[in-house]
C-alpha cells in the first residue's frame, strides 16, 4: 500500500506543477460536510492511505502531512508509515495548524498557490485559510480545481441508491408540520428561505431515508425551502414511484442534483439562510451576495429533540438490540475458550444476532472489536491484515450499534475474558465510576454538555488518567449515529442540553500497546423536577445490556455507585428476560446479580 500511496502522491505533484499549484489540501468531507462520506468523496483516504473518518491531508511539492484527532493517533501512525506523510496530532501542544504549517513550508517561494476544492471545503474554511495565509503576502488560495477528477481513474461513481419512505408511525411528525416549523424559525431570524445541505437534515425533514452512505440511512441531495416552494435537488432515478407520489402530495418540486447552483443563482426570495460553516464554497458563492443571510440551519436543533413517537421508538429498538447483545455475551466466553475466535469472527457473530431482530436495517457504524492492545486504538476496525485471535484472558472492547426502523443504537462493553492484571481492574473500575457519575447527575435546563463533562472524568483524573475524545454525542432516530448540535465534551459547545435529546455516555481510558476500556450507554434527557431555582433535567438510560462485573474492584465503588449498578442490572433483567430462554436467560440472571 505504501508504494501505491507514494506513486499517487508523485502523480499529484506532477499534476500540481502542470496546473500551477504549490500545495493542495484534502479534507475528509463531501459537498454536504458529512462526517461519513460515500466512497466517491474519499479523496483524502485515496491520496494518504489514512482510513479514519476525520482528518486533513496536505501535499506540497516537497512534503506531505496529515492532521487528525486523538481517536486515530495510533491507527494513523500505522497507516501512514512509509507513505511520506507526517502525522500532525490535533490539540496536542506544539502541533501547528494547517495554515501555520503551510506558511512555514511555503515561506521560501516568491509566489505560492494553495488549492482547495471548493465543492468539498466549506465557505468558512476557505475564508479562514485565505485570511490566515494573506498575511504572508506570497500565498494565494484557489478553489476551482479537483485533481481527483483526473488522477483517480477508478473513482467510484456518486451513489444512486433508491430512496424510501419513513412512515409517520416512526417519524411522529409530518413533513408539512416540520416545514411549517422551519419557516417560522426562518422568519424569527429574518430570512425567508433556507438552503439545506446536510444529508441527515434533508432525510429528517422529508421523512425519507436512503443508503448512499455506509451505515448512514441518507441520500445524496440538496433541499431549498423558500416562502412558497420546496425544491429537492436529487438524481431522479433514485426515486421510486411511491416516493415520487409522496413528494408530489407534499408539493415538493424535484430538480436534478447538478442544477442546484443554477437554482441558487435564480433564487427569487429576499433572503436565504446559508450556514457558511457547513455549506461548501461553490454553493455558498452561487447565492447572490445581497440575498445571503448567514446563520445556522434550525433543522439540526429541531431534529435533535425527539418527539414522543421517536422516544418510544428508541426504547423499543434498545429492547430488541439488548436481546441481541445479551445473546452475544452469553455465547462469548465459552466460544473464546473453545478456540478459533478472532476479532472479525466476534464482529460477524454480533451482527448476525442483530440481523435476527425485527426492523433491523443494518449496523450504525463499523463495529469496533479491539482485543487487548487493539482496545487502546479508540476507533479500531479489524481487517484481514490486523485481525488477531481472541484468547481466554485479558480484555476485549466491543463498540457497536444498529439501525432499526424505529431507532439507532450505540453501545460499548469491555469484557473480561479471563485473568486480568490489577492495573486492568483498577482502570476498568475508574471508567465505570465516571460512567455512573455522569448517568446519575441532574442539571439545570439550559446547561451545556461541557458543563457536566468533568463528572465522567473526575474519578480517573484523581488517579492521573484521562481520555482525549468527547464523552457523549447525539444519536439520530434511524439516522446518523453521530448527530449534534449538542455534545458532552471538555471543549466548549454552546448548544444546550434539552429534554427529548439523546446523548451517549462513553468515558474511557486507553493505554497504548496494552489495553483499552470504554463503557457506553445511550441516554435520553428527560425532565427531573422544577424548584425555586428553575427546571432541572436528568438522564433516562435507554441501553439495556449487562455491564461486566468481573473486572470491578468492589472497594473502589461507593454505596451509591453499587446501588446504581444493581438497580440498572435489575432493570436490564426485568426488561430482557421475557425475550430469552434456557442458557441465555440463565446467563443474564447471573450477569445481573447484585454486587
Residue ranges and their predicted role:
Residues 1-595:
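Active-site neighborhoods and metal-handling regions in enzymes and metal-associated proteins
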Amino acid at each position: 500500500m505504501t508504494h501505491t500511496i507514494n506513486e499517487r502522491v508523485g502523480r499529484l505533484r506532477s499534476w500540481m506543477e502542470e496546473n500551477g499549484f504549490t500545495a493542495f489540501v484534502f479534507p475528509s468531507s463531501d459537498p454536504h460536510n458529512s462526517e461519513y462520506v460515500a466512497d466517491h468523496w474519499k479523496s483524502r483516504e485515496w491520496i494518504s492511505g489514512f482510513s479514519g473518518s476525520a482528518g486533513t491531508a496536505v501535499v506540497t511539492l516537497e512534503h506531505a502531512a496529515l492532521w487528525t484527532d486523538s481517536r486515530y493517533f495510533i491507527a494513523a501512525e500505522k497507516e501512514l508509515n512509509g507513505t511520506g506523510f507526517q502525522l500532525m496530532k490535533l490539540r496536542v501542544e506544539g502541533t501547528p495548524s494547517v495554515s501555520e504549517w503551510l506558511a512555514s513550508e511555503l515561506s521560501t517561494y516568491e509566489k505560492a498557490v494553495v488549492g482547495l476544492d471548493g465543492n468539498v471545503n466549506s465557505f468558512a474554511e476557505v475564508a479562514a485559510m485565505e485570511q490566515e495565509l494573506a498575511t504572508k503576502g506570497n500565498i494565494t488560495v484557489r478553489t476551482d480545481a479537483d485533481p481527483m477528477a483526473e488522477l483517480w481513474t477508478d473513482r467510484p461513481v456518486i451513489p444512486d441508491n433508491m430512496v424510501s419512505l419513513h412512515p409517520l408511525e416512526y417519524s411522529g411528525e409530518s413533513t408539512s408540520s416540520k416545514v411549517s416549523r422551519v419557516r417560522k424559525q426562518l422568519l424569527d431570524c429574518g430570512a425567508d428561505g433556507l438552503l439545506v445541505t446536510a444529508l441527515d437534515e434533508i432525510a429528517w425533514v422529508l421523512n425519507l431515508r436512503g443508503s448512499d452512505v455506509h451505515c448512514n440511512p441518507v441520500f445524496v441531495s440538496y433541499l431549498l425551502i423558500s416562502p412558497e416552494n420546496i425544491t429537492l435537488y436529487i438524481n431522479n432515478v433514485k426515486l421510486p414511484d411511491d416516493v415520487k407520489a409522496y413528494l408530489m402530495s407534499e408539493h415538493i418540486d424535484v430538480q436534478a442534483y447538478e442544477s442546484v447552483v443554477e437554482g441558487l443563482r435564480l433564487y427569487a426570495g429576499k433572503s436565504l439562510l446559508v450556514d457558511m460553516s457547513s455549506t461548501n464554497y461553490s454553493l455558498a458563492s452561487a447565492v447572490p451576495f445581497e440575498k445571503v443571510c448567514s446563520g445556522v440551519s434550525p433543522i439540526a436543533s429541531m431534529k435533535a429533540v425527539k418527539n414522543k413517537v421517536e422516544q418510544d421508538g428508541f426504547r423499543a429498538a434498545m429492547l430488541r438490540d439488548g436481546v441481541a447483545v445479551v445473546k452475544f455475551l452469553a455465547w462469548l466466553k465459552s466460544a473464546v475458550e473453545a478456540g478459533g475466535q478472532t476479532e472479525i469472527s466476534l464482529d460477524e457473530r454480533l451482527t448476525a444476532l442483530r440481523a435476527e431482530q425485527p426492523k433491523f436495517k443494518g449496523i450504525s457504524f463499523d463495529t469496533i472489536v479491539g482485543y487487548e492492545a487493539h482496545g487502546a486504538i479508540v476507533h479500531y476496525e479489524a481487517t484481514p491484515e490486523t485481525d488477531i485471535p481472541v484468547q481466554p484472558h485479558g480484555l476485549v472492547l466491543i463498540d457497536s450499534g444498529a439501525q432499526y426502523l424505529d431507532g439507532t443504537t450505540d453501545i460499548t462493553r469491555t469484557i473480561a475474558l479471563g485473568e486480568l492484571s490489577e492495573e486492568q481492574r483498577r482502570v476498568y473500575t475508574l471508567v465505570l465510576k465516571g460512567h455512573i457519575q455522569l448517568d446519575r447527575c441532574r442539571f439545570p435546563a439550559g446547561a451545556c454538555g461541557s458543563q457536566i463533562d468533568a463528572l465522567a472524568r473526575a474519578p480517573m483524573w484523581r488517579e492521573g488518567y484521562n481520555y482525549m475524545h468527547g464523552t457523549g454525542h447525539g444519536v439520530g432516530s434511524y439516522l446518523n449515529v453521530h448527530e449534534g448540535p449538542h455534545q458532552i465534551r471538555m471543549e466548549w459547545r454552546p448548544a444546550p442540553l434539552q429534554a427529548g435529546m439523546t446523548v451517549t455516555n462513553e468515558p474511557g481510558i486507553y493505554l497504548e500497546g496494552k489495553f483499552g476500556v470504554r463503557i457506553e450507554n445511550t441516554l435520553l434527557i428527560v425532565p427531573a423536577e422544577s424548584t425555586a431555582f428553575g427546571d432541572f433535567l436528568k438522564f433516562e438510560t435507554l441501553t439495556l445490556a449487562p455491564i461486566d462485573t468481573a473486572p470491578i474492584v468492589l472497594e473502589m465503588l461507593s454505596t451509591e455507585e453499587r446501588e446504581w449498578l444493581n438497580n440498572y442490572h435489575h432493570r436490564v433483567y426485568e426488561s430482557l428476560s421475557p425475550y430469552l430462554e434456557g442458557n441465555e436467560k440463565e446467563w443474564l440472571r447471573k450477569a445481573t446479580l447484585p454486587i
